Structures are given as C-alpha cells and as structure tokens.
C-alpha cells in the first residue's frame, strides 16, 4: 500500500513538471460567456478550441448550472437565452446588414470596364484595420417578428456604420423598454472627417415617426455601450474629448432630463458595465494597480444619497467579463498570467469565489507554473512604478537566468494579469526566461494623470521608466546581466526600436512586432488619424508646433538607427493598416544595410494580430528560435 501511495505521489509530481509549450497553448479552450439562461439557473457559454491541423477554431456551446454541476453541450443557444434583439413587447426584431452606399470601384464609374480592379477615393477612411472600404456600410434594420416580414433600414441612404467598424456587434443597438424606439451607436462622419474624429454618438430612432434624435449631441468624444436598467434609466460610456481614444471613460446616466456622471470624481477609467437587477447600482470592470477588478457605483436617483464608487474584488488576477447575477452572487470570468479565463461566481456579501467552469484544468494540472511577483521601482522622477516580474517554473535563485524586458502596446492599455495567446508570459517563463513587465507611464490603473502623461511624450519619461525597471531587476543575483533582451508589439514595438538606439549596451537582442519605426510615415499611412493627431501632437508639416516636431524628430526611432548595434527580429502583418507594413520594411532595410544581424518575419494575411493557428505556431517558434540564437 505504501508503495502505491509513493508511486502515486511521484507520478503527480512528475506530471506537474511539464511546462507550457506553443503546442499546448494552442490547444487550450477559450471561453466566451453568452449570458444567463431564461430560467436564471444556468450560464450559457461558448468554448472555441483552435485546430492547428485545420488552421481554424472549432466552437461548442454549453450550459452550466450556477449552483454547481456538470456542463452540458447544446446545439443552439437561442432556445435557452433571451433574444435581446426581439423587442420587449415581442412584436419586432432588430438586426444588422451591410448595405452598398458609395461608389468606389472603377467599374462602378465606368461600366464598360468591368475587368478593372481600380478603386477611387475622395477622402480618407479608404481602409480600416484590415479591410478596404468598398462603399459598403453596416446598417441597423428592424421588421415585424413574423415569417416573411420586410426589414426597414433605419439609416437608409447614410454612409455611416452601425454597428461600428471594425469591432462593433449587436451591442451597438438596443430596444427601449417600451418597444417604441431603437437606440444605436454611430459616428455620423464620412471620409476624412471620419478618420480624424472619435465623435461617436447614441441615436434614438422612433418607430412611429421614423425620426432620429441624437441623445449625446453635447458630447464631442466617444459615446458607447447604451444600456437600460430594469427601471428604464439609460446608462452609457462617455469620453469627453474628440480625437482622444484613451480619454477617461465615465458612466453617464440620463435621469429626469439630466445627465449624471457617476464616475466623474473617481480616478480611473471604466472598461465595461452592467446594471444591477434592481437598477439601484451599476457594476463595472476597470484596471487598478496592475489588475482588472470589479467595482460598484450606486445610482442615487431622486434620493440625496452621495454617489460612491467601491472596489468589490481584489487579488492578483483579472476580472474580464460580467455575465449576470444569481441571488447574492455575480457571475464573472477570471484569468491570471498562469491561467486562461474560466467562469466563476463571486458572493457579494461573503466576498468568496467559486470556480464553476474547468475547461483547461486537465492541462494546467500537469504543468509546473511560473511565479509572478509584484515589484515597486522608483522612477527617475521619483514615482513608484509597479513592475510585474514573472519567474520560470521551478525557479532557483542560486542560478542565473536570461531576462526579457516586455514593452506593452497601446500605448494607453493596461498591463494587468491578462492571459495572451501570443505574448504569453507563462510560455516565455517556461522557456527559461525571466520576464520584466513594467506598468510604465501611459498605463491605465494608476490614475488618469499617469495614463495621460505619455501623449506627446512617446520617447520621453516612458523610456526612463523601462530602463529603471530593467536596471532594478538586473541587480538581482539570479539575473544574467549579459543576457538581457527587449521585446514588444505596436507601441511596444516602437519602444523596442527606440530603446535599440539608446540602450547603452544593456540589451543583447531585440524583437519588435508591428512596431512604429518612423513616426512621420506612420502619420502618413495609418488609418485612424485621430490617434496620431492626439498622441504625436499634430501633423509633421506643422513646423510651428513644438510638440509635433519633437514627435517627428527627437522621438522618431528612425533618427536613432545609426546607434543600433544588436540583433533585431522584426515581425509584420501584411494586412495591418494600423501600423502599416512600411514600418517593418523600413526598420528591416535599415538594419540590413547597416550590417546588423536581423530577420523579417512576414505574415501576408495577418493584421495587427496573428490569428491563424499555424501562423501563431510559426510566430512562437521563430520568437524562441531568435532568442536561442541571439540571447
């Protein structure tokens, strides 16, 4: 008996000595919660599992009892979920379709030349994210909820999108509680004005009259995510400033002819929200101190109760989705740097967690996990900066490890306990690297001022923040100071290109994915011009604009390429219109002509991300191959 127990313990220990690999990472199921069932007793969710062999993902839908139990696969979620697109009175259904509005193709103008593939544009917004504008726009329709009913286009003839491109879905339109109106999100600007503005509004379409009213005309920035409470009060997310996509995101409630900003005095930015069942409070998710947590803000209505924002959850994990409510519990998804998202319930009174789904438990139970540590580093201007340090599995402080400085994109995105299928810290650590991930200037979760500082200062204080982080961690005896690497994507790729010119021989190798190499050509080719207008301070031809000129000279990585002296891997997607292909090409050409060891990893059909499973595998293999060669 003792031998059996000993053998079992040894076997379990051996199982847990496996580490994450690219192959395992791309076998993990990815949860997408769909909602709470009509009877309020079950969670409905989808699991997408990549198939490398088929080069696609396969999805299955499940129901899981909230009270606990086994998940059951179902073929169709429509039977168990309330259809938000059906009007509350059941008479109508709302949906969206793409409609051809503008002439773009040469053959549209010259019918006798049908084999032409020319495209003709008179303004910007000729391409967005990863697709070219072919004159088609997303429009919201409604029709009677019966067989054979004819749909009515509520944006008929308008060359605007709702749902918003490129990522909007049916969350961009909702029914009013009385079924008399459809509310929808739309940026009613076209061409060049569309490309330079973030002024998205919430419109109300009256079914009886066909009239449309702009409910947020007084606000010049983003107005998004409309949602009614059970009491019929409308809430939405709002950013104030036109052109600033990373502005503070507040919760606004329309009440008795007023617009109440519930989060105006809270020093943070809301990710997304959900009304409580009784309509007396709103739960929302926001970044805080290197994580994403659940918050609550009360809606006072006509009472004299003060508005208060309270943080509900706390810990080294990310709360990603608010699925719904069940008694005193809220159903959420939760992830951390070692675990992909799973579904949990959180008891609001007991403050206790219960894990409900275990989609990837069988895989994680076999793995030796990396350890994540919080570290607070003093910056060059005397601030305290959070730095996540991820240590390899079975870490031994008596050994020396090669170490990677991870540069986050955005630049105003939060660096939290996220679980990425590309920039996966667990996988980097499993390959024997320590990862240093600083919450440098520009990150959400450390106050609005910290987030806003990076605009017009891309190559300034933030570069000192990076170097403060790596220098501080490199003091540890277990860091091999002769084997430091620097990696990142998007703004993180910009950071890699910039640091390659100022690192003073700290780093031995660099990897940049879809990074900005030349700020001037970036301004001339990116599609969301409002972003560069704001973050660079203006256009490169504005010679009297000191902030803009600094962005195109001092803060332009291209102007530091003569100081590059270490190997660099440059990765680029061919359909990336956010950071277009020329950025990677310019960087690679400069490195090659300067005689620097360099490699260009090109994905012709990928955008700013790498989404196809086989391409993702090559990305990982080349990433670690490069590090093995050069670090």
What are the language-model segments listed below?
Residues 30, 47-60, 76-82, 96-139, ...:
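A flexible loop/linker signature enriched in serine peptidases of the S9 family
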Residues 35, 85, 174, 227, ...:
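Conserved beta-strand position repeated across blades of beta-propeller domains
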Residues 38-39, 88-89, 177-178, 229-231, ...:
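Residue-level detector of Asp-centered blade-edge/turn motifs that repeat once per structural unit
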Residues 40-44, 90-93, 182, 232-235, ...:
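Hydrophobic beta-strand positions that form the internal "hydrophobic ladder"
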Residues 65-69, 145-148, 206-210, 255-258, ...:
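Short loop/turn segments that connect beta-strands within beta-propeller blades
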Residues 94, 117-122, 127-144, 148, ...:
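Non-catalytic accessory segments flanking enzyme active sites
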Residues 190, 242, 349-351, 359-482, ...:
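Cap/lid segment of the alpha/beta-hydrolase catalytic domain
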Residues 429, 437-631:
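Active-site-proximal cap/loop segments of hydrolase catalytic domains
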């Amino acid at each position: 008996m003792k031998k059996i127990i000993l053998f079992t313990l040894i076997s379990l220990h051996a199982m847990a000595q496996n580490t994450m690999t690219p192959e395992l990472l791309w076998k993990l199921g990815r949860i997408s919660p769909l909602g709470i069932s009509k009877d309020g007793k079950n969670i409905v969710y989808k699991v997408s599992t990549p198939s490398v062999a088929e080069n696609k993902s396969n999805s299955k839908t499940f129901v899981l009892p909230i009270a606990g139990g086994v998940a059951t696969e179902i073929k169709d979620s429509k039977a168990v979920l309330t259809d938000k697109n059906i009007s509350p009175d059941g008479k109508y259904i709302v949906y969206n379709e793409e409609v051809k509005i503008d002439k773009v193709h040469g053959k549209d103008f010259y019918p006798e030349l049908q084999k032409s593939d020319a495209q003709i544009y008179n303004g910007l917004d000729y391409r967005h994210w990863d697709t070219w504008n072919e004159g088609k726009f997303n429009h919201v329709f409604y029709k009677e909820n019966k067989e054979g009913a004819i749909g009515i286009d509520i944006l008929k003839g308008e060359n605007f999108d709702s749902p918003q491109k490129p990522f909007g879905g049916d969350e961009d339109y909702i029914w009013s509680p009385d079924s008399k109106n459809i509310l929808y999100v739309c940026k009613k600007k076209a061409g060049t004005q569309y490309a330079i503005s973030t002024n998205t509004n919430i419109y109300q379409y009256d079914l009886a009259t066909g009239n449309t009213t702009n409910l947020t005309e007084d606000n010049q920035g983003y107005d998004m995510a409309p949602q009614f409470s059970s009491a019929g009060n409308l809430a939405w997310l709002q950013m104030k400033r036109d052109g600033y996509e990373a502005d503070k995101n507040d919760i606004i409630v329309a009440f008795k002819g007023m617009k109440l900003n519930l989060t105006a005095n809270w020093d943070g930015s809301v990710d997304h929200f959900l009304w409580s069942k009784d309509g007396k409070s709103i739960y929302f998710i926001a970044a805080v101190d290197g994580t994403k947590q659940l918050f609550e803000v009360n809606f006072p209505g006509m009472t004299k109760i003060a508005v208060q924002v309270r943080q509900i959850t706390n810990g080294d994990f990310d709360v990603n989705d608010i699925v719904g409510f069940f008694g005193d519990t809220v159903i959420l998804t939760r992830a951390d740097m070692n675990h992909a998202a799973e579904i949990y319930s959180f008891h609001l009174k007991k403050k206790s967690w219960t894990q409900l789904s275990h989609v990837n438990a069988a895989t994680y139970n076999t793995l030796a996990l990396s350890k994540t540590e919080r570290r607070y580093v003093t910056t060059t201007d005397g601030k305290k900066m959070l730095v996540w340090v991820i240590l390899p599995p079975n870490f031994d402080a008596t050994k020396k490890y090669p170490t990677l400085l991870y540069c986050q994109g955005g630049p105003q995105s939060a660096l939290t306990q996220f679980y990425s299928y590309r920039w996966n810290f667990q996988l980097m650590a499993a390959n024997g690297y320590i990862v240093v991930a600083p919450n440098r200037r520009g990150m959400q979760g450390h106050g609005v001022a910290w987030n806003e500082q990076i605009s017009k200062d891309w190559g300034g204080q933030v570069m000192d923040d990076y170097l403060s982080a790596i220098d501080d961690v490199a003091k540890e005896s277990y860091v091999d100071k002769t084997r430091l690497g620097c990696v990142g994507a998007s703004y993180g790729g910009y950071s890699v290109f910039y640091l390659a010119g100022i690192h003073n021989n700290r780093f031995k190798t660099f990897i940049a994915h879809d990074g900005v190499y030349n700020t001037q050509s970036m301004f001339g080719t990116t599609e969301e011009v409002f972003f560069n207008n704001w973050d660079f301070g203006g256009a490169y031809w504005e010679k009297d604009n000191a902030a803009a000129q600094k962005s195109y000279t001092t803060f332009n990585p291209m102007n530091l390429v003569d100081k590059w002296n270490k190997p660099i891997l440059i990765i680029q997607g061919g359909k990336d219109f956010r950071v277009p292909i020329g950025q990677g090409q310019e960087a690679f050409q400069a490195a090659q002509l300067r005689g620097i060891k360099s490699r260009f990893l090109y994905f012709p059909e990928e955008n700013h991300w790498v989404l196809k499973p086989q391409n993702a595998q090559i990305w990982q293999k080349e990433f670690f191959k490069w590090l093995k060669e050069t670090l």
